[in-house]
Amino acid sequence: MASISDSETTNHGSIWDLDQNLDQPMDEEASRLKNMYTEKKFSSILLLRLAFQSLGVVFGDLGTSPLYVFYNIFPHGVDDDEDVIGALSLIIYTLTLIPLMKYVFVVLRANDNGQGGTFALYSLLCRHAKVSTIPNQHKTDEELTTYSRQTYEENSLAAKIKRWLEGHVYKKNCLLILVLIGTCTAIGDGILTPAISVLSASGGIRVQNQKMSTDVVVVVAVIILIGLFSMQHYGTDKVGWLFAPIVLLWFILIGTIGALNIHKYNSSVLKAYNPVYIYRYFRRGKSESWTSLGGIMLSITGTEALYADLCHFPVLAIQIAFTLVVFPCLLLAYTGQAAYIISNKDHVVDAFYRSIPDTIYWPVFIIATLAAIVASQATISATYSIIKQALALGCFPRVSVVHTSKKFLGQIYIPDINWVLMILCIAVTAGFKNQSQIGNAYGTAVVIVMLVTTFLMVPIMLLVWKSHWILVVIFIVLSLMVELPYFTACINKVDQGGWVPLVVATTCFIIMYVWHFCTVKRYEFEMHSKVSMAWILGLGPSLGLVRVPGIGFVYTELASGVPHIFSHFITNLPAIHSVVVFVCVKYLPVYTVPTEERFIVKRIGPKNFHMFRCVARYGYKDIHKRDDDFEKMLLDRLLLFVRLESMMDDYSDSEDFTMMEEKTQGSSNALLLTGKAGSNTMCSTGDLSYSSQDSIVPAKSPIRGNSLTRYSSQTFGDELEFLNLEFLNRCKDAGVVHILGNTVVHARPDSGIIKKVAVNYVFAFLRKICRENSVIFNVPHESLLNVGQIYYI
């Protein structure tokens, strides 16, 4: 392997000017009307149907909380009825302020084209302000139909906030760290939710048989968890239709049982709806009441998952489901349990199961277990989605992402993460064996994610919504007034199980931040080390090499410039393919890039060099699937570009053109071709409309993007065009080779000890255990050529 140092970086003077003239980044495309995402209008019947379906996806975790809340509030039993009333009052108003007021009616509106979660908020901010730490975006990316953002007046508060965020690198890093903290803690939820939900549901088998050992309950829970994680690779496509009926039946059951218990045991518990009992609760219990907030916090677990699992359900459907079904049923369930506990103070440990009438006990137990499985499945799926988003934004090591459904884009499975989650989940379940300590861990994880969301909502409200600063202050003050006391109570229980999410989150944070840091530094190094076009031109059309038949795809992270891997390759192996295509696969801060807008193709240098660049753009929900035939799509776009470029020769003297596919009115497969122009003359030829100042837009493309065909000179009437296309087809028939860089990254000798450990050991270890680029890009092994290099960052 060759070694590269930082001294080989920039070019200056005439060479730099020549390089800029011959190898500009993608030109800005002509402005056009974009199909911006807007909330779709649904009929009333369809809206109710979607609200019903959202129950099984969004609310499972929140709905299973009554299984374990009161036990975690009063782990040592209840002495006074007033304590139960005060705790119930806190539950009622916590449910009202956080899930209902904050999330359902405010935070859900901050979705990224139907996608929720911490990274969705970060993507919104990256589009509205230049806060991304990987500088691989270009203004052409802003022309995507899914790339929506606001414009600001120069002296507006939003413009000042935008400039402040963009002002210094450390502010961008602080924002990224905040996002990673929320993401890492949310991953911890993926471990704790299945553990506490399944363990609590399984505990019902012991209520009817008090002689049964606790170990039996743990074994049953572990068996269920193993089965749950082992079935993940099948996806939920075939059984997903059962989730909504199960969860709806669960909510109806707990609501009905709660109402019966209120009537049967103690209807005076309804006075808990008077918030004065919250004050009395704290005045009487003082430090013990404050400590119990960690248990009360569990009543809103699943609220953050409610936002992360948005899954393209319209916000209105989720609002309907929560306000009409979830919220009232939860209030009845908690109120009924409180009424039962007041009359049976010794049964607080198993209050939920003991309050069930004997005639329906086992059916309710079965539904409870199924509801716990559904809640766990939703959280596991949300964890996959979070990791996929982090992977797309360069914040997670490369892992294999598998589609489990041909119908639904969002249903994915990550094998490596699945088994790690299963092992950790079983370890937590078997290690703690009781709901109390797992509950302490769970509460800590949930409140941290909520605080991160609160802080991220501030720039969202200012930049995206352009809200008045007074409304922003009201939102953050009310949110922190509720969340900070819960946070302090949960942190106080670190030694009682609360350390688990902190350890998990810290480990994930180190992995994600080190990976992102080294990814950014490697990208910056490649930018500084790219080869000048003057050097390429000096080699001549043959590049000073033997041009062998075939097409070489050179993969690079650079969207402009010739990567150093190319010069390293031809220096050590003086032969290159007849056609060279530099392929840049990059992810943008959008949820998806439409297939017809995915590729940008450009020629590099004179035509007789036969060098091209292709940028393939993806959103954080898009996936490289094996059946996509990425290689074939690249070749199709390359042939189409050459044909359209030939058509432009009659109208422009320039040899530098850019082709970008886009949606246009009346044709979903229209293609946009832009180039340098010398006049403002309007011309037309056949189906082509051309303005030399703007663009060429074929309304109906004569070439289909999904087929490679032979072209005759009679078809195009242009011999040069025919020869170019025949040349490309012959090269394609000769074979395609994928050239990937296999770089080893080391810290520079003068680096500090922390950086050396992070780069030379942590990052190196992650590179060894993660998937290779060839696997991620689905490159055939027989067509793969790795080029080794060493980077010092």
Curated annotation (Swiss-Prot):
Extracellular-side segments: 76-87, 197-215, 260-289, 339-359, 433-444, 490-496
Sugar-bearing residue positions: N266, N434
Membrane topology (Cytoplasmic): 1-54, 109-175, 237-238, 311-315, 381-411, 466-468, 518-793
Annotated InterPro entries: K+_transporter, K_trans_C, K_trans_N
GO molecular function annotations of the record: potassium ion transmembrane transporter activity
Membrane topology: Multi-pass membrane protein
Location(s) in or outside the cell: Membrane
Disulfide bonds: none
GO annotation, cellular component aspect: membrane
Source organism superkingdom: Eukaryota
Pfam families reported for this sequence: K_trans, K_trans_C
The UniProt record lists the keyword Transport: yes
Record's keyword terms, sorted: Glycoprotein, Ion transport, Membrane, Potassium, Potassium transport, Transmembrane, Transmembrane helix, Transport
GO biological process, one term: potassium ion transport
Listed transmembrane segments: 55-75, 88-108, 176-196, 216-236, 239-259, 290-310, 316-338, 360-380, 412-432, 445-465, 469-489, 497-517
Job description of the protein: High-affinity potassium transporter.
The family this protein is said to belong to: Belongs to the HAK/KUP transporter (TC 2.A.72.3) family.
Name recorded for this polypeptide: Putative potassium transporter 12
Source species of the chain: Oryza sativa subsp. japonica (Rice)
